[in-house]
A protein has these predicted regions:
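Nucleotide-activated chemistry modules centered on ATP-dependent adenylation/adenylyltransferase
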Residues: 1-262
Length: 262
């Protein structure tokens, strides 16, 4: 029997909700803790669903969902959109080399995984080597979990992928698990200013959450005060000037390296 502390790190989206249902139904073992990182940029729909559906369901089986703030637990060097070293934390689009390319993403690790690590260490005295994180990658996302299973933490048993190894599940099957459980359809979790959004998702922020969209515009413009080549939108145009009315596939975008959109 493992002595590791079992931690379900929920992203608040479809795959994470499927794992939640499987835990509640007893098809997955009960974790010791359920946590979710609050980046300060999450779409309001994620918190609305979490508070209305997920949190009460876990409470019924004696589990609390711990919402952990980036502002309180992120490392001082990486709390803002620009790190203290000057590099961007988010995977913005850049025209630095004369054509549109994409920067590396540091936000998921610095604003989610490491934030939860510090909370466990400071609050409970549990170190990274003493816990096993459950992450909600689904079976049809090998680009996201493939590199992870080759890593030291997975090989040391510190990472668990319930929808890959315990109950192999594809995203469309995760949706059915949630529906069969009787929960409403979960939102697609993401930050409202994430460069990985499709135009469909940007348009949703613009129409349904205008205050958040204005915040995204301000951050887009603030980035270029320090880096004139950086843009939030894939067109490498200022966000306020982008036509978001063209049709787009809801699931055409996503992050290949982080723990978002889960």
């Amino acid at each position: 029997m493992s002595s590791l502390v079992e931690v379900f790190s929920t992203g608040g989206g479809t795959q994470s909700c499927a794992i939640s249902c499987l835990i509640i139904e007893g098809k997955l073992p009960r974790p010791d803790y359920v946590v979710i990182a609050d980046t300060g940029r999450e779409m309001p729909t994620t918190w609305q669903y979490l508070d209305a559906v997920v949190r009460p369901a876990f409470k019924e089986i004696g589990l609390e969902v711990h919402r952990i703030s980036k502002e309180e637990y992120a490392a001082p060097w990486g709390r803002d959109i620009f790190a203290t070293s000057g590099h961007l934390m988010i995977p913005a689009f850049t025209t630095q080399n004369g054509e549109i390319s994409k920067l590396s993403a540091f936000c998921s690790s610095a604003w989610k995984a490491e934030v939860c690590d510090r909370w466990f260490a400071k609050t409970l005295g549990i170190t990274r080597s003493q816990r096993r994180y459950w992450i909600g990658f689904s079976l049809d996302e090998p680009k996201r979990w493939g590199r992870m299973i080759d890593g030291k933490e997975f090989k040391s048993g510190l990472i668990r992928l319930p929808l890959v190894h315990d109950i192999p599940t594809r995203r469309h099957e995760a949706i059915r698990i949630v529906e069969k459980h009787g929960w409403p359809k979960p939102p697609r979790s993401r930050c409202f200013d994430c460069p990985n959004q499709s135009d469909f998702e940007w348009a949703e922020v613009q129409s349904d959450y205008p205050k958040n969209f204005q915040q995204a515009i301000e951050r887009d413009e603030t980035m270029r005060l320090r880096d004139t080549h950086a843009f939030l939108h894939q067109s490498a145009k200022p966000l306020r000037d982008v036509d978001l009315k063209q049709p787009d596939d809801l699931f055409s975008a996503g992050c290949p390296s982080g723990e978002c959109f889960l």
